[in-house]
UniProtKB/Swiss-Prot annotation:
InterPro entries: Aldolase_TIM, DapA, DapA-like, Schiff_base-form_aldolases_AS, Schiff_base-form_aldolases_CS. This is 4-hydroxy-tetrahydrodipicolinate synthase. Pfam families: DHDPS. It is found in: Cytoplasm. Its EC number is 4.3.3.7. It catalyses: L-aspartate 4-semialdehyde + pyruvate = (2S,4S)-4-hydroxy-2,3,4,5-tetrahydrodipicolinate + H2O + H(+). GO terms for molecular function: 4-hydroxy-tetrahydrodipicolinate synthase activity. Belongs to the DapA family. It comes from Thermosipho melanesiensis (strain DSM 12029 / CIP 104789 / BI429).
Length: 288
């Protein structure tokens, strides 16, 4: 499993279809990051068909043959999740990002057996993805580490719970070989300085090199440099979530000339106020 900055990449669209020309140009900006996370929340995974996955995953794999490629496969159905697991295996993913089942609101024991079932039916490494603000369920640190103890291929957690109480508990209890990634750019500096293993980042769609530089400064002990980078881009971190992700990040990348500002319903392009805020911040941060 990687350490460092993994970009949760967008899926660019044009006229309703995946825009592979734009995707190729976008991927070129991502050479410095440590991993690519494909078909997560930022990639609009629920709106991507199996047939599209069969083209999209190999496209990214071919572009970055040696960079870790983690593919999102989580749904609220164990049967459908396993279909996506087998699809990711077939298309040469390195690891799986599996979100906690949304809408169903399972108990901790239900979550345990869900992840255990998946782990028993694949050899790929699994990152548990905890994002209670979207799913309506929070997986407890104790459940995560029981899974890590019982399932050898459950090797990491993406923690997108903004509660520092939970984050501190997660980092305090984690086994030495288990990795924990933040899913929140706006606390990435504090998370990494507290011993986190990396960030699965939305902001690195826009500022990949700067996010990598912040991480490198932290692990080399240059905390003041890392802090300066973090607070330089802190307004961007916040702005990327003033509407539902990935609406703002797609707007930002459109302003930068990298992609069309197109999403699939029920997601809808950013309003004018959001666009103006993003333009202002991108200029202030000298990104455009």
């Amino acid at each position: 499993m990687f350490s460092g900055i993994g970009t949760a990449i967008i899926t660019p669209f044009k006229n309703g279809e995946i825009d592979y020309h734009a995707l190729k140009n976008f991927l070129e900006t991502q050479r410095m990051v440590d991993a690519i996370i494909l078909l997560g929340t930022t990639g609009e995974a629920p709106n991507i068909s199996i047939e599209e996955r069969d083209k999209l995953i190999p496209f990214v794999r071919e572009y970055f043959p040696d960079k870790p490629l983690i593919v999102g496969v989580g749904t609220n159905s164990s049967h459908h999740t396993m279909e996506l697991v087998k699809n990711a295996e077939k298309n040469k993913a390195d690891a799986l990002l599996v979100v906690t089942p949304y809408y169903n609101k399972p108990t901790q024991i239900g979550l345990y057996h869900y992840y255990k079932y998946i782990s028993e039916h694949t050899d790929l490494e699994i990152i548990i993805y905890n994002v209670p603000g979207r799913t309506g369920v929070n997986i407890a640190p104790e459940t995560v580490y029981k899974l890590a103890s019982d399932c050898k291929n459950i090797t990491a957690l993406k923690e997108a719970n903004s509660s520092f109480d939970q984050i501190n508990k997660v980092l305090h209890l984690k086994p030495e070989t288990f990795k924990v990634f933040s899913g929140n750019d706006d606390i990435s500096f504090q998370f990494l300085a507290s011993g986190g293993n990396g960030v699965i980042s939305v902001a690195s769609n826009v500022i990949p090199n700067q996010m990598v530089e912040m991480y490198k400064n932290i692990i080399s002990g240059n905390i003041s440099n890392a802090r300066k980078i973090f607070y330089t881009y802190y307004p961007l971190f916040k702005a990327l979530f003033i509407e539902t992700n990935p609406i703002p990040v797609k707007q930002a990348l459109n302003i930068m000339g990298l992609i069309e500002n197109e999403l699939r319903l029920p997601l809808y392009p950013a309003n004018k106020e959001t666009k103006n805020i993003l333009e202002k911040i991108l200029k202030e941060c000298k990104i455009i």
